[in-house]
């Protein structure tokens, strides 16, 4: 398959640059994988799409204020985007400056904090904080929320709350698991009252999620890796749900990738998973765990629209996106969502 097969024209005004006033006031496009049937809904209508005994799996990662500004020893300005925290003092990061900092040179951050450039690993830089504080403490103090490039505006105070799920619990992501942004505490309670169970996985979304696919053939793409965890508790809940005829509904592509990574690593029955994953899901992939998913609208030619096409069918997804554009749905991280059921192989 060609990467260009997943292209589409999106009017600029459909890119959501701010969230809706209320988390649940987004629209929800439903897509039935088997029939291709579409439905225009409000997000709270998700209550009518789930059944007692279903299990909804959320990604509980917390977005860290991963963008730092500072200058090199030479005085040149630079911007650091944390890709992942290696420990309390060291990070792997993308560095943007006129010239890359050299190994063993110092970087002075806003707020007077200092870092040393330890090594370069391909496109990423390894830096160490020279301070008694931890990296996380410094990020919380002087870091900026790492809004995606297509939002195309500086971060604002409101983003610290809204570019974050209400159930975030595990700091480490540099991008939000955006399907989860539509849920507030009241909706989560209503799902529980309906008899829908919930479970939480962790996948720390990396900046690689915004990297364009740079090859012509889908099969040639090398996926970035991200750290994921699926606990024994989640495994047990999935087994119970499947045994009683319920569906596993993944909230977001990161939850899908976490669960399918665990399944891929398990020989027979699903096992807990706790390590890096570079799973790349594209048409032809057979899903082993997930029956339905909630997801936002994705970028053209992205690995995420490839994942969705694998799940609900290439033609079905193409048609759904054409419908969404015609009906002026809001796209990307702060945009509207879809509720999608799996197409049988």
Curated annotation (Swiss-Prot):
Pfam families: Queuosine_synth. One of its GO terms (biological process) is queuosine biosynthetic process. Transmembrane segments: none annotated. Keywords: Cytoplasm, Queuosine biosynthesis, S-adenosyl-L-methionine, Transferase. Pathway: tRNA modification; tRNA-queuosine biosynthesis. The keyword DNA repair does not apply. One of its GO terms (cellular component) is cytoplasm. It is an enzyme of class 2 (transferase). It is found in: Cytoplasm. Gene3D superfamilies: QueA-like. One of its GO terms (molecular function) is S-adenosylmethionine:tRNA ribosyltransferase-isomerase activity. Its EC number is 2.4.99.17. The keyword Phosphoprotein does not apply. It catalyses: 7-aminomethyl-7-carbaguanosine(34) in tRNA + S-adenosyl-L-methionine = epoxyqueuosine(34) in tRNA + adenine + L-methionine + 2 H(+). It comes from the Bacteria. Belongs to the QueA family. Transfers and isomerizes the ribose moiety from AdoMet to the 7-aminomethyl group of 7-deazaguanine (preQ1-tRNA) to give epoxyqueuosine (oQ-tRNA). NCBIfam families: PRK00147.1, queA. Monomer. HAMAP family: QueA (MF_00113). This is S-adenosylmethionine:tRNA ribosyltransferase-isomerase.
